[in-house]
Amino acid sequence: MYTREQLIALVQDHAATHETYPFNKTNSHETIIWTVMKHNASNKITAMIFEREAVLYLTLKLTPDHVDEMIKTRGIVRAYHMNKRHWITIAVNATDATKQEMLGMLAESERLTK
């Protein structure tokens, strides 16, 4: 089981990223806190971390073929808030994807966002 802080650290340990919070409004009633991990070189979004209804999510960019393959895995869906052809969202603590698979997808997302 990962916490938000552990997931942020995992992403930073395995991808050249920095965290930003561009979608969070201080005067909003929005309860979802978005942690956007941007590639250090390109400043493009590499990963997004958020929680909704006590579920921790990680959004990553993959090739379209890899997206089609991974959405067959429990706990992985097309990212509703991104281009669904290229992005997936993983329910981190409720997926059948292994840590190694998630790290592989993170590496792919980092490569695609350079």
State each model region's role.
Residues M1-K114:
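Charge-dense, helix-prone N-terminal extensions
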